[in-house]
Amino acid sequence: MLSRIATSSLGLSRSATGVIATQSRQISFDLSETQKEIQDAALKFSKDVLVPNAAKFDESGEFPWEIVRQAHSLGLMNPQIPEKYGGPGMTTLETALIVEALSYGCTGIQLGIMGPSLAIAPVYISGNEEQKKKYLGALAAEPIIASYCVTEPGAGSDVNGVKTKCEKKGDEYIINGSKAWITGGGHAKWFFVLARSDPNPKTPAGKAFTAFIVDGDTPGITRGKKEKNMGQRCSDTRVITFEDVRVPAENVLGAPGAGFKVAMEAFDMTRPGVAAGALGLSWRCLDESAKYALERKAFGTVIANHQAVQFMLADMAVNLELARLITYKSANDVDNKVRSSYNASIAKCFAADTANQAATNAVQIFGGNGFNSEYPVEKLMRDAKIYQIYEGTSQIQRIVISRMLLGHFAQNGTSRI
C-alpha cells in the first residue's frame, strides 16, 4: 500500500521507488566484521591490561608509559592517522570504538593513550603536506605525546578571551603567554598553540588568532607542575608557559589570522571520541552494577530482585544505548565528510551526562561499598565528572545545539536537521 501511495501521490516512478527501497536496506546499525574485530581487540587489551592496573595508576598518579607503549605497538594509539603518514588509517567510528573499549578499563589510562587526538585534529584538517608528514608521521612512528594548547587561566569556554599573543618578526613569530589544563603537557613532543595575532580587541575572533605547531624542545617553554585532579589522575595535566618562544613561520597552521577556525573545526572531529570515552565509562558502570546486584543480598534476596534497583539498571541501559547511537552517528558524520557540530555536540553532551548519572546510580546500587575505594565505582564517579567539562562544557554544548536548532528552524520551518 505504501509503495502505491509513494508512486501515485508523490509522482515517483516504479524505478525510483525501487532505488529508495534499495537505499533503505543499506541502513544498518550493525558493525562490520572488521569493526567488530577492532572493538574486540581493544576490549581484550582493556580488560587484560587497563582494568588490573587502573587502581594503581589512580593512586600513584604516574603516567602509564608502559601501557601507552603497548597500545602503540598494537595499533591502538592514534589509530586515525592515515596510512600515507605511517598510521593505521582507521575511520573516526573505528577510533571511537577503540576509545569506548579502552575507557571501559580506565578513562585516565585511555586519555594517556588517546590524548594526542585533539592535537592531531587541527594538523589533519588544516596542515600542509610537509606538516602532516613531519608531525603526524612522528606520532605514528613512536609512542609520543602531542598536546592541544588553547585553554588559559582566564579563557576556557570563552576562546575569544585567549591572551597568549604572537608577534611576527621576519620569518618567525614570537609567542608569549600561559596555557592551563593542558592534557599531556608534561610529556608533549609538540604543541598545537592558539595565540592572538591581532592586538585590537574589536577584531572578530575569526581574524584575530593564528594557530601554530610548536616543538616541545623550543627554548622559552616552561612546563608547570602536574596538577592533582579529582579524577583521571594518571593523565598528565599542567600549565604550559611560553616566554619569547620563537616559532618559524612555516609552522603556522592554515593561514595567519585563521587560527580560531582551525581550533574550532577540530572539535567536530574529536567530540565523538570524547563522547565515546563517556560511553565506555557508562558501560563499565552498568556491568559493575549488574554484577553486584546479582550477588548482593538484602531482605532475603539478591538486590537485583528489588524494583528500585531494577529501575536504576534500566535507566542506565536506556541512556547508554541512546548515547551509543548518537555517538556512532556523529562519528559516521565525520567519516562521510558531513560537518555536523549539531550531532557532535548532542553526542558529547548526552554521553557526558549519561556517564555522570550512570556513575551516581552505580555508587547508589553499591551502597556504602560504593563510597569506598576498595570498589571500582568510587573511581568511576570521580572520573565521570570531567566529561561534562573538557572539550566544551555540557552548557556550551547546549548553546551550540540550541543555536543550530533555531537557525535551522528559521530557514526550514522544522526542527529536524
Curated annotation (Swiss-Prot):
Positions annotated as active site in the UniProt record: 391
Any one Gene Ontology cellular component term annotated for this protein: cytoplasm
Residues involved in substrate binding: 157, 268-271, 392
Annotated function: This enzyme is specific for acyl chain lengths of 4 to 16.
Residues the record lists as binding FAD: 148-157, 181-183, 306-307, 364-368, 393-395
Top-level taxonomy: Eukaryota, Metazoa, Ecdysozoa, Nematoda, Chromadorea
Organism: Caenorhabditis elegans
GO biological process entries: fatty acid beta-oxidation; medium-chain fatty acid catabolic process
Pathway annotation from the record: Lipid metabolism; mitochondrial fatty acid beta-oxidation
Top EC class, one word: oxidoreductase
Family: Belongs to the acyl-CoA dehydrogenase family.
Protein name: Probable medium-chain specific acyl-CoA dehydrogenase 10, mitochondrial
